[in-house]
């Protein structure tokens, strides 16, 4: 763990998410529709839908909105036929970036993603150019002060692969992405509620950015995040606030 605070980064991420709740709801509705279309409308037998519905609950989305999105997906209604496309590229100093999109117009989407990269000092790469630098995992982060021994016992029993304590005292639990919901349920049943719980592309190594480079990198990430077709942006860049 480097010198930056993982806990501070997570709190900043949550605050930013709260500020963009309307956009988050729009993304979740698209994800719910696609998950229901591909795997059916029963969250108990559709892990992808279960994950999306859980995210919607965490984002305080009304249940009626969730149900309508599921119904549209299962029924194949207009608007549910999105295509999943992943773009990969580089930011400042070669930092790795993955951009996951859901789109009904890939020509529009690739043009917008490429423009964001080029405008803010990055460039798009080819398929597979940076994805190998990330692991597809379930990630949980618990607040400093959480009992490490008790959490480790519960996590490993639940099927987690790794438990580690960061320099700032927060505790990170990692699991196979396909086991995410089962591990989450088991940890909550044991009394452990994560401050962050998500399936993510976790970088194998991180690169810290400070000063002007940090500001430039943040502008690129924000530009990508703000595109309507973008669902998730992953990077190995860590913006250090000074």
UniProtKB/Swiss-Prot annotation:
In the UniProt record, the signal sequence range is: none
What the entry lists under Pfam families is as follows: TACO1_YebC_N, Transcrip_reg
The GO biological-process annotations, alphabetized, read as:
regulation of DNA-templated transcription
UniProt cross-references to Gene3D superfamilies, sorted A to Z:
1.10.10.200, 3.30.70.980
Question: Which keywords belong to this entry?
Answer: Cytoplasm, DNA-binding, Transcription, Transcription regulation
Note the coiled coil stretches, chain numbering.
none
Compartments, record wording: Cytoplasm
Q: Which GO terms describe its molecular function?
A: DNA binding
Main subcellular localization, coarse class? cytoplasm
One GO CC term on file: cytosol
What InterPro entries does the entry give? Integrase-like_N, TACO1_YebC-like_2nd/3rd_dom, TACO1_YebC_N, Transcrip_reg_TACO1-like, Transcrip_reg_TACO1-like_dom3, YebC-like
Q: Which SUPFAM superfamilies match?
A: YebC-like
Family membership = Belongs to the TACO1 family.
**PANTHER family, A to Z:** TRANSCRIPTIONAL REGULATORY PROTEIN YEBC-RELATED, TRANSLATIONAL ACTIVATOR OF CYTOCHROME C OXIDASE 1
Matching HAMAP family: Transcrip_reg_TACO1
Q: What is this protein called?
A: Probable transcriptional regulatory protein BamMC406_2210
| Organism, as annotated | Burkholderia ambifaria (strain MC40-6)
């Amino acid at each position: 763990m480097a010198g930056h605070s993982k806990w501070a980064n997570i709190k900043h991420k949550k605050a930013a998410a709260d500020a963009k709740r309307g956009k988050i709801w729009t993304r979740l509705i698209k994800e719910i529709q696609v998950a229901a279309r591909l795997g059916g409308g029963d969250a108990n037998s559709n892990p992808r839908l279960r994950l999306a519905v859980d995210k919607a609950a965490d984002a305080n989305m009304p249940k009626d909105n969730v149900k309508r999105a599921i119904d549209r997906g299962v029924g194949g209604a207009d608007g549910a036929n999105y295509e999943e496309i992943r773009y990969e590229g580089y930011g400042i100093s070669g930092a790795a970036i993955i951009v996951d999109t859901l789109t009904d117009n890939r020509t529009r989407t690739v043009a917008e993603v490429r423009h964001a990269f080029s405008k803010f000092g990055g460039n798009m790469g080819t398929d597979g150019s940076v994805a190998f630098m990330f692991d597809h995992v379930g990630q949980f982060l618990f607040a400093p002060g959480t009992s490490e021994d008790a959490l480790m016992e519960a996590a490993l029993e639940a099927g987690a692969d790794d438990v580690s304590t960061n320099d700032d005292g927060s505790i990170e639990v990692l699991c196979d992405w396909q086991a995410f919901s089962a591990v989450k349920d088991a940890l909550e049943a044991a009394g452990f509620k994560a401050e962050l719980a998500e399936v993510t592309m976790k970088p194998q190594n991180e690169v810290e950015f400070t000063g002007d480079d940090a500001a430039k990198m943040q502008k690129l990430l924000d530009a990508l995040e703000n595109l309507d077709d973008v669902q998730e942006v992953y990077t190995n860049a860590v913006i250090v606030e000074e």
